[in-house]
């Protein structure tokens, strides 16, 4: 008698898990990853604030776009990935032997890995950006605030 309801419940649970819906067991991992992301963003911000390198000072003139939304959903981290790719292009990190730019590249690689892990299989989201732009330090401050908001909603 309850077999159909049980099967429906199992099917719904599998559909939610397959589509990346957070489960109670994944919340702890998500919190750790968001905390790591937050730490890497803060470390990257400290390196970017260092103006002793010509490439870094060039980066401070580049304009970045922020997403239109004020939500704290993990799917919006895709927008961070898109803008980090542009930051990497601006810095032209590949041939650089400078210690600061190598460290920035390492932090960015770590950020990308964490964001991809947090996103899971969700790839259908399209970022919508504000028309106004921000400079590099403000860009990173806003993403740090975004990650702090996500972390506080998970705790």
From Swiss-Prot:
S-S bonds: 79-127
A molecular function (GO) term: cytokine activity
Coiled coil: none
SUPFAM superfamilies: 4-helical cytokines
Cross-referenced PROSITE patterns: INTERLEUKIN_2
Cited Gene3D superfamilies: 1.20.1250.10
GO biological process, any: adaptive immune response
Main location: secreted
InterPro entries noted in UniProt: 4_helix_cytokine-like_core (IPR009079), IL-2 (IPR000779), IL-2_CS (IPR030477)
Pfam families assigned: IL2
N-terminal signal peptide: 1-20
Keyword Secreted applies: yes
Keyword set, alphabetical order: Adaptive immunity, Cytokine, Disulfide bond, Glycoprotein, Growth factor, Immunity, Secreted, Signal
GO cellular component: extracellular space
Function according to Swiss-Prot or TrEMBL: Cytokine produced by activated CD4-positive helper T-cells and to a lesser extend activated CD8-positive T-cells and natural killer (NK) cells that plays pivotal roles in the immune response and tolerance. Binds to a receptor complex composed of either the high-affinity trimeric IL-2R (IL2RA/CD25, IL2RB/CD122 and IL2RG/CD132) or the low-affinity dimeric IL-2R (IL2RB and IL2RG). Interaction with the receptor leads to oligomerization and conformation changes in the IL-2R subunits resulting in downstream signaling starting with phosphorylation of JAK1 and JAK3.
Family: Belongs to the IL-2 family.
Protein name according to UniProt: Interleukin-2
Organism whose genome encodes this protein: Capra hircus
């Amino acid at each position: 008698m309850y077999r159909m309801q049980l099967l429906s419940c199992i099917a719904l649970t599998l559909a939610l898990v397959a589509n990346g819906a957070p489960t109670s067991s994944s919340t702890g991992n998500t919190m750790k990853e968001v905390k790591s992301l937050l730490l890497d963003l803060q470390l990257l911000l400290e390196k970017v604030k260092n103006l002793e390198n010509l490439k870094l000072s060039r980066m401070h003139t580049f304009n970045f776009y922020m997403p239109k939304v004020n939500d704290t959903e993990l799917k919006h981290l895709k927008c961070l990935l898109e803008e980090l790719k542009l930051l990497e292009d601006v810095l032209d990190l590949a041939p650089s032997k400078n210690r600061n730019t190598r460290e920035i590249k390492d932090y960015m690689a770590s950020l990308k890995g964490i964001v991809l892990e947090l996103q899971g299989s969700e790839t259908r989201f399209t970022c919508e950006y504000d028309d106004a732009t921000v400079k590099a330090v403000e860009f990173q401050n806003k993403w740090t605030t975004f990650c702090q908001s996500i972390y506080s909603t998970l705790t």
